[in-house]
């Protein structure tokens, strides 16, 4: 066993924590909106993955401390209250090797509960660490703490972590999570020379609480019932807003973020969409991009000028920095795909890709032009896995048959909450999710119970083997990115309309090495058949990753091996989160209506 690597990013203005991960209580008061806040910062160097990181198959323990606090920040030039992690926006990068144990001590100084999800990691044997309040745990209370511990097994690639409580991810609680392996198909030094993270997200000038409460009200947000377009686009935590539109005299126009890459190299760019709403289209002037990874699966993909990426997805591309000399600069363009927005305006976020060498860093802005074949604003929103065949580099064929198949019909509609209030929301199988946040479904099943089908749609698979999940997006004009917790899936087939169980025997499926992902963009009025192996006991969330849709109930669960779940041993620290809480209470709006 390798040595313990402690990487504690401590917020300097907080007093020392004394056994907080054991007591569940913090010695410092939770955030008070009336108290002046520290200023959260963005460190561009964290998005540069160092060649000094040792990629090895010798497992070790990587330990982090996350302090969640309120702070002030103006990542796009407009100052607002944010949720920072260790006074960073976005939060720290977690970097590990396959086989490593990751320990994260989360100290919650906020005025609301929290839970941290490790997006894309399977959590083999550690379902209770998946980080979803009301599904796999009770919330980390204000002034409380909790330690997540899990081993990264049989996975490598690009992942990320984020809050799964309400839509506070949109306030800043997220960060990249990169897993290396000496056995992964893409090798540093052979397939690429340098490694960079490019994380994109929409950014609102209002806090997520304000937006969610408005969306579930009759008035809507900014007079509309539909999720908003961002006020700005952030690239690696920085962007540029329209200061004139804000009406704020203190608004500034910051320089665009920069991504420095050595000249004459092969550079891997790991794109992560942490957006709460839009699909983005990303291009780099003068540079073609070879797609080599999606959602932690190394693939053979096309070389293209522009990628599309929806919330929760990750794509790695390789570019060759041979289009100029040291000091040259090129625009990286991130545009909102307007065809899948209810309403919207043309919005482009810019970053500078700058060639570096042995000399000093230049500062001139690029004068490059966009590719002439980029998508138009009204081009239909189509995922890359639908436009191209992304063939996994590690061959895994699918069986002709499955043990069982379940259907989840996804649709916007009128619903009534547990308090008798009527609202327009989203659901699966005519059920909108309402979250009994202090009685997690994983614990319900462990006690021998079942999921309440009037509160959440669910699919249960009792036995180990290949099983099918059919998602029918019945919203004819609304696309959704669906994310599966606890496993990746093989994309067996997709098409227009809806697929029923009666149709399945006559449906052509992809059996030869299907694309493997954990997040899939589905156009309105379409179906997709996802194949999983039901070998990881747990209650796993399956939901739309548009945070504002999730706020209005677009969540289901997949229950895998309920008999095995009954054998889970609950650590005392996990049980303490639920102590002295009302098990009949309903949770925040991202999971229900209140």
UniProtKB/Swiss-Prot annotation:
Subcellular location(s) per record: Secreted; Secreted, Cell wall
Enzyme Commission code: 1.10.3.2
The protein's required cofactors: Cu cation
Residues in the signal sequence: 1-20
Catalytic activity: 4 hydroquinone + O2 = 4 benzosemiquinone + 2 H2O
Keywords from the UniProt entry: Cell wall, Copper, Disulfide bond, Glycoprotein, Metal-binding, Oxidoreductase, Repeat, Secreted, Signal
Assigned protein family: Belongs to the multicopper oxidase family.
Protein name listed in UniProt: Laccase-2
Provenance organism: Cryptococcus neoformans var. grubii serotype A (strain H99 / ATCC 208821 / CBS 10515 / FGSC 9487)
Lineage, highest ranks first: Eukaryota, Fungi, Dikarya, Basidiomycota, Agaricomycotina
Gene giving rise to this polypeptide: LAC2
């Amino acid at each position: 066993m390798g040595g313990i690597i402690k990487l504690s990013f401590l917020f300097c203005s907080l007093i020392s924590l004394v056994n907080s991960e054991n007591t569940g209580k913090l010695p410092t008061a939770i955030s008070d909106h009336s108290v002046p806040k520290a200023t959260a910062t963005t460190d561009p160097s964290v998005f540069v993955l160092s060649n000094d990181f040792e990629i090895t198959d010798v497992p070790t323990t990587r330990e982090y401390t996350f302090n969640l606090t309120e702070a002030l920040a103006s990542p796009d030039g407009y100052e607002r209250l944010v949720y920072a992690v260790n006074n960073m926006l976005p939060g720290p990068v977690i970097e590990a090797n396959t086989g490593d144990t990751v320990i994260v001590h989360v100290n919650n100084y906020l005025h609301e509960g929290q839970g941290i999800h490790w997006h894309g990691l399977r959590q083999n044997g550690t379902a209770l660490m998946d980080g979803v309040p009301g599904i796999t745990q009770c919330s980390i209370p204000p002034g409380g703490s909790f330690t997540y511990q899990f081993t990264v097994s049989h996975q490598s690639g690009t992942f990320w972590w984020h809050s799964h409580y309400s839509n506070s991810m949109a306030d800043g609680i997220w960060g990249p999570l990169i897993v290396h392996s000496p056995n992964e198909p893409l090798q540093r030094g052979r397939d690429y020379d340098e490694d960079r993270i490019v994380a994109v997200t929409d950014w609102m000038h209002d806090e997520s609480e304000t937006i969610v409460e408005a969306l579930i009200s009759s008035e809507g947000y900014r007079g509309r019932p539909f999720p908003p377009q961002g006020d700005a686009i952030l690239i690696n935590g920085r962007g540029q807003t329209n200061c004139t539109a804000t009406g704020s005299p203190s608004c500034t126009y910051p320089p665009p973020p920069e991504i420095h890459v050595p000249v004459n190299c092969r550079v891997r760019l790991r794109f992560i969409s942490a957006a709460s709403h839009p699909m983005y289209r990303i291009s780099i002037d003068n540079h073609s991009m070879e797609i080599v990874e999606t959602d932690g699966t190394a693939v053979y993909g096309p070389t293209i000028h522009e990628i599309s990426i929806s919330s929760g997805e990750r794509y790695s591309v390789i570019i060759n920095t041979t289009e100029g000399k040291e000091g040259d600069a090129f625009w990286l363009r991130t545009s909102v795909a307007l065809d899948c927005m209810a309403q919207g305006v043309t919005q482009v976020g810019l970053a500078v890709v700058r060639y570096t060498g042995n000399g000093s860093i230049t500062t001139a802005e690029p004068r490059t032009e966009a590719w002439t074949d980029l998508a138009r604003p009204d081009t239909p929103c189509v995922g890359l896995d639908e436009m191209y065949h992304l063939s996994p580099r590690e061959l895994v064929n699918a069986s002709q048959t499955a043990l069982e198949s379940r259907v989840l019909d996804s649709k916007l509609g009128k619903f009534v909450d547990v308090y008798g209030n009527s609202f327009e929301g989203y659901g699966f199988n005519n059920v909108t999710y309402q979250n009994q946040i202090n009685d997690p479904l994983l614990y319900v099943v462990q006690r021998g119970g079942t999921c309440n089908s009037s509160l959440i749609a669910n699919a249960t698979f009792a036995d180990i083997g290949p099983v099918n999940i059919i998602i029918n997006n019945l919203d004819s004009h609304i696309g959704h990115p669906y994310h599966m917790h606890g496993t990746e899936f093989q994309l067996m087939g997709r098409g227009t309309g809806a697929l029923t169980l009666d149709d399945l025997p006559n449906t052509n499926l992809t059996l030869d090495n299907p694309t493997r992902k954990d997040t899939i963009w589905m156009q309105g009025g379409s179906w997709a058949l996802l194949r999983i192996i039901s070998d990881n006991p747990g209650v796993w969330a399956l939901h739309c990753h548009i945070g504002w849709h999730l706020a209005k109930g677009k969540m289901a669960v997949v229950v895998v091996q309920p008999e095995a779940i009954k054998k889970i041993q609950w650590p005392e620290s996990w049980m303490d989160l639920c102590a002295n809480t009302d098990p009949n209470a309903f949770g925040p709006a991202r999971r229900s209506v209140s």
